[in-house]
Amino acid sequence: MRTNRWLFSLACMLSVFVCGNAQKTPSPFQRGDRVVFLGNSITEGGHYHSYIWLYYITHFPDMRMRMYSAGTGGDSSWDMLERIEEDVYGKNPTVVTATFGMNDSGYFEYNGDNPTAFVERQMYRVDTTFQAMQKIMKSHKDTRVIMIGGTPYDETWQNEKNKPFLGKNATIQKIIRLQREAAVTTVGFLPYT
């Protein structure tokens, strides 16, 4: 009997911890929302935002909203930080989505002399940049923010000319962890996959 009470108490404590640390699930877009999608080339040319818009316009034709792409090919989080006020908040959004990680995580450096040191430097830079980005996002109190975890990198693909960047996907996962942790207290989070 004592063991059952102890297990029940442990289960209760763990559920409080898990629920307290769960990221927020973003709420659906609403009538009149102005949504800006911040990102890199995946946002600029990936068209996922147009699919989201098509879903809303075909399922809820009377729900008018505007959606804008603020994706720029080749951008890393530090590039996005430089343009976030003008390119994103200059459109007076009610919702901002942000995704980054592919360019932040680097490329050919994984095949260099010291990829471990490179990853440490990049993660410091991404973390510092993301903290500054979060301050800007929090200062726009009337705007909901949704973090979208970065896309994965396929380290198994090979051809005669290119060598895969082994370790890149692990770095992307570290960046996604930063985004997910931010979602616990301030924003929503969606995995890209």
Predicted segments, located by residue:
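Structural signal for short hydrophobic segments within the conserved structured cores
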Residues: 68-70, 190
